[in-house]
Structure formats: structure tokens, C-alpha cells
């Protein structure tokens, strides 16, 4: 009797699958031949076709997403901000990791580069999954199509990414918003090189975004400048030739992102205002005079300074031989490691039916 019941259940599930496929397939495969659907674009690399939202949802519902990731919005190098980008997960992480860190294997040991790339890839994956979950945009990231990456760098980065592509960072069971910046710089609040907390930078206390030391900022900011093409220490001069250093400064005028919009300072009893955004968050700069006594502002770091520092990450991997998990645990307080997307293609309606049929 049990065998008959199991057989009947499998037959019913199979019939349901056939009916649903007949109903849904025409909408999913309306394009003829090899012609891409209207609005679709091939962006380079494996399985990187941008397909309309409706068809993407239909295909995912039927077959599951497999080793792909779909972002509502993502910047693609050379193409700008694109909507509903579906990429092979590994390609996606390789492309964004290359954009973020470049060929650091040319400047540090291969072992250090592998750990740094792994840490970056896990942070990227966590960031993408967080913004997918909460329906927000990941347009701060730029994906470099894998066929545009030099072959030596591509193979080295892919070797690192392939080992961690399913890993994400979690806090209390939920994937985290794993933000990072190029260089944390000198934190004048704590008096050490280190990151800013989410509370310091944005006014929001996030348990895993706390201020931590990052001792290799000074040592590696020149390295990161060569890699990414930006200098992480800037000196701005005012129009005063008084020879006096700043006596005081008001840096409380910030935008919603926590960046100082303008700075009012006092030099030799006269008030000046520097208008324009700083290149780093509050607490990541100080005030002094240059060798000629001209007042100047020293900026340390590049970016918001919250979460993982790329300079610090490379430094920990190179100088201490730290592994990617220890690096991530250092910069993201109290996190755990989880997995998202196991590489299985068993998702979607048919995945459920195959399970019901006992074929998995």
C-alpha cells in the first residue's frame, strides 16, 4: 500500500510538472532561435546575459537560479549602470574583485594576494546578498567583464574566488552589509590607524561595524595608490600665509553619508571656510602646518573608513600571513560564516518536484 501511495504521488507530481511547463514555457522562451530577447545585452564572460525581469523571474521560478546571481542594478565597466543584471556568480565575484583590488599579486606574495582576494570576494558576496535581500541598489560596485581582465590576473583571482564563492558573512543569522573602503587612514578620535565605526561615520550603531585598529594603512597606502590609481593622503592649503597652524576647526557640517561638507577653521584669529567634500570620513584627517609654516589639512585614508580596509587587509595578509577568515573577523566584529547558493541547480519549481519524485 505504501509503495502504491508513493507511486501515485510521483505520477501526480510528474503530471503537474508537464502541465505547468506547457503553460509557462512559451512566455519564457518567446525569442526565436539564438536571438536575444528585447532589451537583452551580452556583457562578456560566461553566462552574463542581461535578460528582462519578467523572463528572469519565470526561468528562476521554473528551474532555479543555479550558480547565478541577479542584481536589480549594477555598474558594468564601459556600460554604466544596468538594470536586472544576471551573472554567473563566480564571474561576478571575479570581476568586482578585480575592479576593487586589481593585480595585487604583482606587489605582494602570491599567498598574501590569494587571502586578500578571498576576503574581498566574501565581503562582495555578502554586500550583494544584503542589498538583494533588502531591495536596495549595489550601484557603488563596478563589475569588470571577465573577458576584459588580463588572463594572468583573471586566473589568479578565479583560483581564490572559486574556493569561497558560496561564503557570506552573517550576524545573528542574517547576511551583513559588509561595507569596505580603500584605506581607513588615521583615526584622530582614537589616536591610532584604524577604521571608523558605523556610529562615528553615519550615526547608526551597527554591531559588526565597530572601530578596529588597522596598523598597515600608512605602509600600504602607496601600494594601493599604484594599484587603483588614487592617492590616499592629500594636503589642502588655504589662502592664508600667516605661518600659523590651525587653532580650531568645526567639522560638524555633514551630509547624510557622514562626510564633512565644509570645514570652518580659525588661523591667526581669522576664520576660513573650506568648501567641498573631504576624501575620507570625519576623524580621518587632522590639521597642521607644512615645512614652510603654511596651514594645511592632512587627509588620511580614502572612502568612508567603515568596515574592512583594503590597505589593512593586504597588510595583514602580507605582514602577518593572516588568512581571509581571520581578516574578515577582525574588521567585522562578531560575525559568522554562512553559505548562499551551493552551486546546485535544484532550485525553483522543478527542484521541488524532483525532490517530491525522489530524484534528488
What name fits each language-model region?
Residues 2-360:
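Conserved, single-site charged/polar hotspot
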Amino acid at each position: 500500500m505504501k509503495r502504491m501511495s508513493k507511486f501515485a504521488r510521483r505520477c501526480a507530481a510528474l503530471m503537474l510538472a508537464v502541465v505547468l511547463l506547457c503553460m509557462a514555457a512559451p512566455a519564457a522562451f518567446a525569442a526565436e532561435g539564438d536571438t536575444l530577447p528585447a532589451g537583452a545585452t551580452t556583457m562578456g564572460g560566461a553566462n552574463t546575459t542581461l535578460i528582462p525581469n519578467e523572463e528572469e523571474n519565470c526561468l528562476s521560478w521554473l528551474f532555479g537560479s543555479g550558480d547565478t546571481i541577479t542584481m536589480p542594478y549594477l555598474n558594468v565597466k564601459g556600460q554604466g549602470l544596468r538594470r536586472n543584471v544576471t551573472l554567473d556568480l563566480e564571474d561576478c565575484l571575479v570581476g568586482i574583485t578585480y575592479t576593487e583590488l586589481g593585480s595585487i599579486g604583482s606587489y605582494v606574495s602570491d599567498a598574501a594576494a590569494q587571502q586578500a582576494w578571498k576576503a574581498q570576494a566574501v565581503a562582495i558576496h555578502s554586500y550583494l546578498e544584503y542589498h538583494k535581500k533588502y531591495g536596495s541598489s549595489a550601484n557603488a560596485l563596478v563589475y569588470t567583464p571577465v573577458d576584459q581582465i588580463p588572463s594572468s590576473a583573471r586566473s589568479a583571482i578565479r583560483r581564490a574566488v572559486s574556493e569561497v564563492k558560496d561564503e557570506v558573512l552573517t550576524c545573528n543569522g542574517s547576511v551583513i552589509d559588509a561595507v569596505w573602503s580603500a584605506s581607513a587612514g588615521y583615526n584622530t578620535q582614537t589616536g591610532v590607524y584604524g577604521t571608523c565605526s558605523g556610529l562615528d561615520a553615519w550615526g547608526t550603531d551597527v554591531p559588526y561595524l565597530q572601530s578596529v585598529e588597522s596598523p598597515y594603512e600608512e605602509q600600504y597606502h602607496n601600494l594601493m595608490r599604484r594599484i587603483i590609481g588614487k592617492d590616499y593622503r592629500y594636503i589642502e592649503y588655504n589662502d592664508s600665509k600667516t605661518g600659523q597652524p590651525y587653532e580650531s576647526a568645526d567639522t560638524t557640517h555633514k551630509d547624510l553619508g557622514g562626510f564633512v561638507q565644509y570645514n570652518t577653521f580659525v588661523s591667526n584669529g581669522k576664520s576660513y571656510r573650506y568648501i567641498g567634500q573631504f576624501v575620507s570620513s570625519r576623524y580621518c584627517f587632522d590639521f597642521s602646518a607644512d615645512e614652510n609654516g603654511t596651514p594645511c589639512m592632512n587627509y588620511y585614508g580614502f572612502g568612508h573608513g567603515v568596515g574592512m580596509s583594503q590597505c589593512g587587509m593586504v597588510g595583514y595578509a602580507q605582514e602577518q600571513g593572516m588568512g581571509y577568515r581571520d581578516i574578515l573577523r577582525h574588521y567585522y566584529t562578531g560575525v559568522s560564516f554562512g553559505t548562499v547558493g551551493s552551486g546546485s541547480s535544484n532550485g525553483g519549481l522543478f527542484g521541488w518536484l524532483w525532490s517530491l519524485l525522489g530524484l534528488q
